[in-house]
A protein has these predicted regions:
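Conserved acidic donor-binding segment of nucleotide-sugar-dependent glycosyltransferases
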Residues: 310-321, 329-335
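Conserved donor-binding/catalytic core segment of Leloir-type glycosyltransferases
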Residues: 139, 172-193, 199-206, 219
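A short, well-ordered alpha-helix in the C-terminal region of glycosyltransferases
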Residues: 329, 336-350, 358-362
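Short hydrophobic beta-strand element within catalytic cores of glycosyltransferases
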Residues: 286-291, 295-298, 308
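Acidic donor-binding loop of glycosyltransferase active sites
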Residues: 260-281, 294
Length: 381
């Protein structure tokens, strides 16, 4: 099996998703990770606590990007080329029984016996050298992504495989929760995770309810590069009240501690957006919070609709006014908050690593069957 990830040298959600899959399959297949930049498999143990020690690594540098000193492999840069620079990966793919395109590089044509394209979201238009329709299987991470796969590329999904989420914490206890609202999301330079809007909402709540201002706090946690004007703006606005805390670049243990203490979880990515690319395609941090008895109050859009059952395991909002209303409802009703926290915890079990592994192994058993000349079985989609 060959797994190609042109962005393997970045610590992102897409990389983690496929690395989790590789970790499951490495005992079953001879796996080679195909990458374009210098990196070691050991990095994934450091970044994600994922052991890929049974996989091999093959670095194939693409001359088009190397000659220009480009670190980020961006397929949009090659549209004016007469020949496809990614043909070097196409030629490599013939060496494998199964070839997996792990991170949506649409311009790689597969030549393996069987092939799978993993689509986290179809954010690019069809264009020159587009080859996704040549893959035997297309895997998506949510029904939301599946819908837009059909809308944008006219392609059907073979398998919907929700990301594996494993943030269960023995220290999380409903009886030990703080009066804390938590959000965990990257501080994107363009502000797509809506931290400023969440601060403004919390400031409005503090003005409306003096008890809330005195007893509750908002913590915004997430990663940020060293130079990030948006993050600077978030920090500045948070200074308006003393009960807003900004926590950047925390490690996994520190994030777990926040989840274990938080009572309510906010996720606002997609607020006031109409571009489907800017709405959360799944929402792993929402599930992480639910696994720690945090009641989610999240945007009513994208993959969040598949995670949170409105009024049962949390609330979904469409405006800042609704975000305030649902939050106050939870703050002022301890019984409701505890009931929803239990429901959220139970709901989160749908998105566990065990469920991911079960569905993935069933799917690859089907692929093995096809390689041996058998009829393909029906898979979950």
């Amino acid at each position: 099996m060959g797994i190609y990830d042109h962005a393997f040298h970045f610590a992102g959600g897409g990389q983690r998703y496929v690395a989790e899959l590789a970790q499951i399959l490495q005992d079953r297949y001879d796996i080679t990770y195909i990458v374009n930049k210098d990196i070691s498999l050991e990095k994934y143990r450091e970044w994600f606590d994922i052991d890929l020690s049974k996989c091999k690594l093959k670095i194939i540098k693409i001359p088009f990007f190397e000659e220009r000193g480009i670190y980020i492999i961006d397929e949009c840069m090659i549209i004016h080329q007469d020949e496809n620079p990614f043909d070097v990966i196409k030629n490599e793919s013939i060496n494998y029984d199964i070839f997996i395109n792990a991170n949506m590089l649409t311009k790689v044509r597969p030549l393996s016996s069987l092939s799978a394209f993993i689509c986290h979201f179809p954010d690019k238009d069809r264009g020159k050298f587009f080859n996704v329709e040549r893959y035997d299987y297309v895997i998506t991470n949510s029904s939301y992504t599946t819908h837009w796969l059909k809308q944008k590329w006219g392609l059907d999904c073979t398998l919907r495989l929700y990301p594996p989420v494993n943030m269960f914490n023995d220290t999380s206890d409903l009886g030990e929760k703080d009066k804390m609202i938590l959000s965990v999301a990257r501080f994107e330079t363009g502000g797509s995770k809506k931290q400023l809007e969440m601060i403004d909402t919390f400031l409005d709540l503090c003005k409306k309810d003096k008890r809330l201002k005195k007893e509750w706090k908002l913590i915004l946690a997430g990663g940020t590069p060293k130079v990030n004007p948006y993050y600077d703006k978030v920090k500045q606005r948070a200074k308006r009240v003393s009960n807003i805390e900004i926590r950047a670049n925390l490690n996994n243990y520190e994030i777990k501690q926040l989840y274990s203490k938080a009572s309510i979880f906010w996720h606002a990515c997609g607020l006031n957006e109409i571009d489907p690319r800017l709405i959360e395609h799944f929402g792993m941090t929402t599930v992480e919070a639910m696994q720690n008895y945090c009641v989610p109050v999240v945007i009513d859009g994208g993959g969040q609709r598949e995670i949170v059952e409105h009024g049962i395991s949390g609330f979904r909002f469409t405006s800042k006014e609704e975000l305030k209303s649902y939050t106050l409802k939870l703050i002022n009703d301890d019984y409701l908050r505890e009931k929803m926290a239990k429901n959220a915890y139970n709901r989160s079990k749908k998105f566990t690593k065990e469920e991911f592994e079960k569905i993935a192994l069933e799917f690859f058993s089907d692929i093995e069957n096809r390689l041996r000349g058998g009829e393909p079985m029906e898979v979950n989609s």
